[in-house]
Regions:
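Hydrophobic core
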Residues: 13-18
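C-terminal beta-strand-rich structural cap/linker in extracellular carbohydrate-active enzymes
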Residues: 176-197
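Short proline/glycine- and polar residue-rich coil/turn motifs
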Residues: 126, 169-172
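Surface-exposed loop/edge segments in extracytoplasmic proteins
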Residues: 158-166
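Beta-strand signatures of extracellular beta-sandwich domains
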Residues: 150-152
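Feature for mature exported/ectodomain regions
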Residues: 2-4, 20-112, 118, 123-148, ...
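Solvent-exposed strand-loop boundary residues in beta-sheet-rich modules
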Residues: 155-158, 192
Length: 294
């Protein structure tokens, strides 16, 4: 029988990795200038401002808990944890306010949360009569790419999470323009790269996956998919049905490379904790691939 070859074998694990930790920056350090309203239904007495978060004013207590945890200098939290705490269904397609598909678990925070609110005299409100298009100057937005950043905003009354697209970005000044359908806590998030690297079984949360990877981590191309899957399942059935409905036999597939990790590169660490789906092109070290078998 002619054997089919798979170019790489990816081990899927779940392990939490840390996001950025903040040294309690002031609101002036995060957003040094007052927002400029481009479009919005505000009265002459109303002013759009940013201020330190006031979690005690949030009607949704879960939002208050999440914002407090993210802004805690002594707490390390990644986006996947934030999404789970806010009960964001990552099995469903998530889109920005401009209807662009996005996987927020592949982002990390660049700032802590700050409150975007309307001030009228001495009164602060988190409610708005329609969308507000505004320009914000964000220090962390300097020298970033527009396509890689979003604003994550949470409605403190309903708990609804929005991923707000950046419409304009001045990399020199950090000035961003975006449209908000609601007000409340907001932070800047940036897409993180998904990379391939040498396997690290010691970092895997799943012991079965770790044990299987340890057995194969030093083996070069030529092992079967069965060699890997056998240690992960309690069945001897070699037939597997893929998501597209196709049924394959594990013994028909042989590795054309050594085992590698696909991981999320976050700050100075790696994370395997991803929700949703990912379309990716995977690059391998040329020395690890058996090109003659392809």
């Amino acid at each position: 029988m002619k054997r089919k070859y798979f170019s790489i074998l990816l081990a899927a694990m779940t392990i939490a990795a840390s996001a950025n930790v903040y040294a309690a920056p002031s609101i002036g350090q995060i957003i040094p200038e007052a927002p400029k309203v481009v479009e919005g239904n505000l009265s002459n007495k109303q002013e759009l401002i940013v201020k330190d978060v006031d979690t005690g004013a949030y009607k949704d207590k879960k939002v208050a808990e999440v914002v407090t945890k993210v802004n805690d200098d002594n707490t390390k939290v990644n986006m996947n944890e934030i999404l789970k705490d806010l009960k964001v269904d990552t099995t469903e397609t998530i889109k920005t306010n401009t209807e662009k598909k996005v996987n927020p678990s592949l982002y990390e925070s660049l700032t802590p949360f700050v409150d975007l609110v309307i001030k009228e005299d001495d009164k602060i409100t988190y409610e708005t009569d329609g969308a507000i298009k505004t320009t914000l100057t964000i220090e962390a937005a300097k020298d970033v790419k527009k396509k890689d950043v979003l604003l994550m905003q949470i409605d403190p009354t309903t708990g609804k999470v929005a991923f707000v697209a950046i419409e304009k970005l001045d990399k020199a000044t950090g000035e961003v323009t975006a449209t908000f359908d609601s007000l409340g806590p907001v932070m800047l998030i940036e897409k993180v790269p998904v990379v391939t690297k040498k396997v690290s079984p010691e970092k895997y949360a799943d012991e079965k996956v770790a044990d299987a990877a340890k057995k194969l981590k030093d083996q070069k191309a030529g092992f079967t998919l069965t060699d890997f899957i056998d240690d992960l399942t309690d069945t001897e059935n070699k037939e597997v049905t893929l998501d597209n409905g196709q049924t394959i036999n594990l013994d028909d597939y042989v590795s054309a490379s050594s085992l590698i990790d696909m991981a999320i590169k976050m700050s100075d660490d790696y994370s395997y904790d991803m929700s949703g789906s990912l379309d990716a092109q995977v690059n391998c070290d040329i020395d690890s691939v058996d090109w003659k078998s392809l």
